[in-house]
């Protein structure tokens, strides 16, 4: 019998993992990438005798596929995808494909902001509790690679809307939806499409599964009834009492999974390692998931108080001459920057700008007027930023490198100020990615 042909588009982390798993399951595998393939992935393909091509898509080969697994970074509108859809070849993503070959518990985490933090925190709790848990999706390793070579009992998955779009049969045992605010509107015809994409994390869930979501998020609250959700709901809120679920009472996180008088779990927000209102939400979501899995309360408390977040997320990394430097380069949209500003009660010099994804800066206006004494624009086109804030910020300066941004901001700062890199924009105009932007910022500060 002829082997089923699988073509994998995109040879990054997820593509390489999908290729290795497909090969292990007996498929005829071909990997195609329109760009250059990194040496580490070429080595993986060679070791596993997987055919590949780079810097091109040979359509003749691609269109022979029985199934195509595409990288989440490839838009459905891409020319290569249009031809695949015309031939009615089934298309799925790496997570969807990998989930067919494992019966392990899946914890899926999505939302516009806070995904990585909540995913890392949830994984930290599971690991410390002694569970064999893998970290995959948008963070950590490829799920397919782990399923093929290093299987775990639990997988904690950070899921972007693009990854969710490529799923049909995937089911989360525990689904977490943190928030929904306008983002990636360059990839979606409308905000409604983006909302539907985020809610699709609940697809295929049954009453035996859990859906943890933020009750305070207006978009989630307004759209909840329009989605047919079968899972057990566990809302979390800092504004009202939610049972079953999590809520705040006198600065105590209270989790009550059953409708009993006695709470399942309590902890003071002052003991959380992650500070700021948005991080109370992230901590609540992870703690509810951990309680559903019956992890011991002491372990959850320890993890919520000793967790160290990933780089580039409100990362306070230096104090020079009484000025605090904070790297929040991961803030690639306006809402992330709103959360960052909301966390500070001292004068802020804000480094803002980059590739604008259709930002509405009016959301930031009140906080900027209240807290920001100067704005340093780090991007090629800053007209929108000047227009949005010229009325309430006297000093707005344009710069074109991280070194220049740090030198300018330092010159404007006085003791007790915070210099905050929280750009509200993507980074591709001046930097490789947000990590590169954050590291260049930190290097420039260290050179002061």
Walk through the language-model features, giving the residues of each:
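Short internal beta-strands
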Residues: 28-34, 211-215, 351-352, 371-380
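Short beta-strand "acidic-cap" motif of Rossmann-like dinucleotide-binding folds
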Residues: 29-33, 134-135, 156, 235, ...
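Phosphate-binding loop of NTP-binding sites
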Residues: 4, 23-24, 59-63, 72-215, ...
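Nucleotide phosphate-binding/pyrophosphate-handling subdomain across enzymes
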Residues: 2-5, 15-25, 132, 267-373
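C-terminal helical cap/extension that packs against the catalytic core
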Residues: 42-43, 362-417
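Beta-strand->loop->alpha-helix junctions that form or flank phosphate-binding loops
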Residues: 55-56, 92-96, 229-248, 303-305, ...
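Residues in the short beta-alpha loop(s) of Rossmann-like NAD(P)-binding domains
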Residues: 12, 35, 139, 216-217, ...
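N-terminal leader/targeting and accessory segments in enzymes
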Residues: 1-93, 97, 275, 387
């Amino acid at each position: 019998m002829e082997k089923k042909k699988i073509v994998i588009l995109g040879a990054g982390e997820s593509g390489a993992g999908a290729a290795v798993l497909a090969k292990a399951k007996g498929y005829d595998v071909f990997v195609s990438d329109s760009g250059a393939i990194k040496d580490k992935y070429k080595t993986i393909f060679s070791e596993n005798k997987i055919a590949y091509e780079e810097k091109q898509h040979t359509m003749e080969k691609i269109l022979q596929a029985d199934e195509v697994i595409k990288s989440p970074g490839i838009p459905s509108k891409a020319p290569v995808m249009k031809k695949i859809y015309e031939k009615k070849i089934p298309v799925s993503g790496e997570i969807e494909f990998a989930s067919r070959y494992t019966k392990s518990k899946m914890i899926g985490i999505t939302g516009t902001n806070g995904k990585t933090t909540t995913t890392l925190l949830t994984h930290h709790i599971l690991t410390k509790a002694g569970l064999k848990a893998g970290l995959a999706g948008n963070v950590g390793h490829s799920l397919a690679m782990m399923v093929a070579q290093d299987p775990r009992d639990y997988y904690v998955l950070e899921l972007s809307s693009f990854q969710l779009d490529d799923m049909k049969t995937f089911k989360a045992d525990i689904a977490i939806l943190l928030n929904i605010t306008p983002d990636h509107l360059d990839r979606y015809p409308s905000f409604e499409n983006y909302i539907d994409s985020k809610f699709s994390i609940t697809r295929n869930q049954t009453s035996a599964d859990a859906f943890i979501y933020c009750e305070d998020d207006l978009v989630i609250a307004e759209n909840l009834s329009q989605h047919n959700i079968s899972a057990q709901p566990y809302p979390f809120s800092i504004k009202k009492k939610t049972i079953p679920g999590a809520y705040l009472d006198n600065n105590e996180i209270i989790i009550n999974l059953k409708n009993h008088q006695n709470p399942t779990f309590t902890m003071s927000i002052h003991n959380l390692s992650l500070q700021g209102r948005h991080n109370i939400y992230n901590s609540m979501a992870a703690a509810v998931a951990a309680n559903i899995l019956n992890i011991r309360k002491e372990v959850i408390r320890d993890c919520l108080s000793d967790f160290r977040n990933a780089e580039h997320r409100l990362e306070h990394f230096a104090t020079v001459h009484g000025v605090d430097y904070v790297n929040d380069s991961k803030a690639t949209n306006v809402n992330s920057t709103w959360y960052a500003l909301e966390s500070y009660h001292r004068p802020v010099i804000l480094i803002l700008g980059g590739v604008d994804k259709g930002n509405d800066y009016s959301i930031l206006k009140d906080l900027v007027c209240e807290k920001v004494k100067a704005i340093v624009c780090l991007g090629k086109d800053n007209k929108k930023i000047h227009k949005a804030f010229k009325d309430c910020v006297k000093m707005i300066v344009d710069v074109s490198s991280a070194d220049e941004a740090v030198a300018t901001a330092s010159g404007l700062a006085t003791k007790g100020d915070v210099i905050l890199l929280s750009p509200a924009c993507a980074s591709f105009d001046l930097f490789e990615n947000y990590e590169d932007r954050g590291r260049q910022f930190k290097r420039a500060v260290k050179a002061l």
